[in-house]
């Protein structure tokens, strides 16, 4: 506001100021103001001198570009103005000041009233700005001497004043009134002779003579070019001053160098001492810094319960589970019974895949996962630890057990059914790298099983032996947990029924342990997945307990919805045509079921907990791509044949396992006989269809091998037939 007002006021007052400018003064042209605002490199002063009525003021106006005025108005005081001029095409901005000098000014006193009498003393008392008042040659770069060629006394003024001009100032003698040449009195030769004969010391500046006519602007170009001489002389003087300054600076620098040579800075011994002192000073802070980062790095690893271990575990898969074993159980114990504390320690070994799933699970069901987040990261750690590449990844027995343990209570079954689709989608996207959820569950189950049943697991690398050991271990783990969590047992029982007959007991035991942790939303889907797949794999073995398993899973209203859906999907070859919801759940469960079974079978032969032998990518790829039943039959027979080879040696063990599985299924069926009847019929039909679809030898091999692989987690072929059979159906 104020700036705008000032501008308005200034614009209003501008004309008044112009009016108040005294004689001999004027405001600078706007164009010149803009030009000089950028900066002025040179200030050049040109003085116009001459007798009265010789055309000084006319020349002064002409240099400004103003028109010629016929009327003669004597100038009372010195006038100064700036003109546009530049040296040829250079970018140097030169401010040229032209002075219209008055030798004797006549200043008239302006009174308020009428002048009544003449007072000579009063007139003399007043002074005007003229040549007598100041030295016009001070800082002058050029002089223009003017005379009237028709008047001799004007030339006498030149003869009198020219010698007074400083010798270093160039002078241009200009004979004006050339348009009145017929009346001329002074010839050009007379002027040149005078200039040439003028006594000037050597090195004096230049004198030039020219004629002009202000009426028709004749001679202005010559005068304009004459200004180059004062400019070049000014430039040379400026450069000389710069050279002098340069020389002075050079001398000063030489003096400084001579002094510097004698100072301590040039003493090499002192310099070395200073360098040593500096190095010591830097070394101490560096050491402190080096120590500080190590504690900093350690601190993040120690405080991080599950997530931190997940990040650190991939580098060191085995040591990571030990840390979570100590830290995870206390964290999980308050929200969940002690049975649940055991699975979390196993989980920490699978960090990377578990981490991504944890974030997804948190987004899907934060309420239910409030307690499970710590256990989830822990199981995820083991999977990645063993998996160095997609092809090398092989789920261990941990997957099946983890699925069973992760079974949530009946109340969470509905949520699990909805979440199963999301988890399946995640597992599908991650099929190549390995299903993080499946790997996490496998790790959890294996870790728990290893400490409790570690002696029986190493009993034999054979898949059948591993299966029996894993089932016994799971049964042991389940025993303490069954008491605290009866509801989860119901969920686990249908799951175990779906699974192979021998695996029913271990899943029951592990299921309660996981059920103790209701927060696992995807636990039910994962468990049910492996169980369903196992049931589909061993149709021959499932026959004895088929009726019991089906009845319990289908008739059990309290059982997890996801588990029921899985049972239908696994049993029905036409399940895809059924409800869209059932299809989604079935797809989710088979995908996870396959990884869980595969991990159990794979880990069994190599080492029960960590070393998976068979590559997971093939298994998951089949599940993801073969959800519609494409090419699963081929994978199934190949794997079944492989299992048959492996199962030939432990055929006795397989039979024993089958008997044990049948007994376990019968026990579970007795507990839930009402629910089992309904599912027995459906499962019997589905198993018949599977038998028809499967080749006879593959049925026998797959039935026995899959049971052994599922229980021991080592049979490589079991995982393929499990997922393949379901997909074929």
From Swiss-Prot:
Where along the chain is composition biased (Low complexity)? 290-315
Q: Please indicate if the UniProt record lists Glycoprotein as a keyword.
A: yes
GO terms under cellular component: centriolar satellite; centrosome; ciliary basal body; cytoplasm; cytosol; nucleus
Cross-referenced InterPro entries, in alphabetical order?
A: P-loop_NTPase, RABL6
Positions of the region Interaction with CDKN2A?
655-693
Output compositional bias ranges, type Pro residues. 331-351, 606-615
| Residues recorded with modification Phosphothreonine | 599
Q: How is it modified after translation?
A: Isoform 1 is O-glycosylated, while other isoforms are not.
| Residue stretches of biased makeup (Polar residues) | 489-502
Sites bearing N-acetylmethionine, chain numbering: 1
> Which residues lie in Acidic residues bias regions?
596-605
Short name of any one Pfam family annotated for the protein = Roc
Gene3D superfamilies to which the protein is assigned, alphabetical: P-loop containing nucleotide triphosphate hydrolases
Relate the protein's function as given in its record: May enhance cellular proliferation. May reduce growth inhibitory activity of CDKN2A.
Q: What is this protein called in UniProt?
A: Rab-like protein 6
């Amino acid at each position: 506001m104020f700036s705008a007002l000032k501008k308005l006021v200034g614009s209003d007052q501008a004309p008044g100021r112009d009016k108040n400018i005294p004689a001999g003064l004027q405001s600078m042209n706007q164009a010149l103001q803009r030009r000089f605002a950028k900066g002025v490199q040179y200030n050049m002063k040109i003085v116009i001198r001459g007798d009265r009525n010789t055309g000084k003021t006319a020349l002064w106006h002409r240099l400004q570009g103003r028109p010629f005025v016929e009327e003669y108005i004597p100038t009372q005081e010195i006038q100064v103005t700036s003109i546009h001029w530049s040296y040829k095409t250079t970018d140097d901005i030169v401010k040229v000041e032209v002075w219209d000098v008055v030798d004797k000014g006549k200043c008239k006193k302006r009174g308020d009233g009428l002048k009544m009498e003449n007072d000579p003393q009063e007139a003399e008392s007043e002074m005007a700005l003229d040549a007598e008042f100041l030295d016009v040659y001070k800082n002058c770069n050029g002089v223009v001497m003017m005379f009237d060629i028709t008047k001799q006394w004007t030339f006498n003024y030149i003869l009198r004043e020219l010698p007074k001009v400083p010798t270093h100032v160039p002078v241009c003698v200009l004979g004006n009134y050339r348009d009145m040449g017929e009346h001329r009195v002074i010839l050009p030769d007379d002027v040149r002779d005078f200039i040439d004969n003028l006594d000037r010391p050597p090195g004096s500046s230049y004198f030039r003579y020219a004629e002009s006519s202000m009426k028709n602007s004749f001679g202005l170009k010559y005068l304009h070019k004459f200004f180059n001489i004062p400019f070049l002389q000014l430039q040379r003087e400026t450069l000389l001053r710069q050279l002098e300054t340069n020389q002075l600076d050079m001398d000063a620098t030489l003096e400084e160098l001579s002094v510097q040579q004698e100072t301590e800075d040039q003493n090499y011994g002192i310099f070395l001492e200073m360098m040593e002192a500096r190095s010591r000073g830097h070394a101490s802070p560096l050491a402190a810094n080096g120590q500080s980062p190590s504690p900093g790095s350690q601190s993040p690893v120690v405080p991080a319960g599950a997530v931190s271990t997940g990040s650190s575990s991939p580098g060191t898969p085995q040591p990571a589970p030990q840390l979570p074993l100590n830290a995870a159980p206390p964290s999980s114990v308050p929200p969940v019974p002690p049975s649940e504390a055991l699975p979390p320690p196993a989980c920490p070994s699978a960090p990377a895949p578990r981490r991504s799933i944890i974030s997804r699970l948190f987004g899907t069901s934060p309420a239910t996962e409030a307690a499970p987040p710590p256990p989830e990261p822990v199981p995820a750690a083991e999977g990645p630890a063993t998996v160095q590449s997609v092809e090398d990844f092989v789920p261990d027995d941990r997957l099946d057990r983890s699925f069973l343990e992760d079974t949530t209570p009946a109340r969470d079954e509905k949520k699990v059914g909805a979440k199963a689709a999301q988890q399946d989608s995640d597992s599908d996207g991650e099929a190549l790298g390995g299903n993080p959820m499946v790997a996490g569950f496998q790790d959890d189950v294996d870790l728990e099983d290893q400490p409790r049943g570690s002696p029986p697991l190493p009993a034999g690398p054979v898949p059948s032996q591993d299966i029996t050991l894993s089932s016994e271990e799971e049964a042991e783990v389940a025993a303490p947990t069954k008491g605290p969590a009866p509801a989860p047992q119901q969920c686990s029982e249908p799951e175990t029924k779906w699974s192979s007959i021998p695996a029913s007991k271990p899943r029951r035991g592990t299921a309660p342990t996981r059920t103790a942790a209701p927060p696992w939303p995807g636990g039910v889907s994962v468990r049910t997945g492996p169980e369903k797949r196992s049931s589909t794999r061993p149709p021959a073995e499932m026959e004895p307990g088929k009726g019991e398993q089906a009845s319990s899973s289908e008739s059990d209203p309290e059982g997890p919805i996801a588990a029921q859906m899985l049972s239908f999907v696994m049993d029905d070859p036409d399940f895809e045509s059924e409800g869209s919801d059932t299809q989604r759940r079935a797809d989710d469960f088979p995908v996870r079921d396959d990884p869980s079974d595969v991990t159990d079978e794979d880990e069994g032969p190599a080492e029960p907990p960590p070393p998976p032998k068979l590559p997971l990518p093939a298994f998951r790829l089949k599940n993801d791509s073969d959800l519609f039943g494409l090419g699963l039959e081929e994978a199934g027979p190949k794997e079944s044949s492989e299992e048959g080879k492996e199962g030939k040696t432990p055929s006795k063990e397989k039979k024993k396992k089958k008997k044990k599985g049948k007994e376990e299924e019968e026990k579970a069926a007795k507990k839930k006989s009402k629910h089992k009847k309904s599912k027995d019929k459906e499962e019997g039909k589905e198993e018949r269809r599977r038998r028809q679809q499967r080749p006879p030898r593959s049925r026998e091999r797959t039935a026995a091998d899959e049971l052994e692989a599922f229980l021991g987690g080592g049979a490589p072929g079991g995982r393929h037939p499990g997922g393949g059979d379901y997909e074929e159906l």
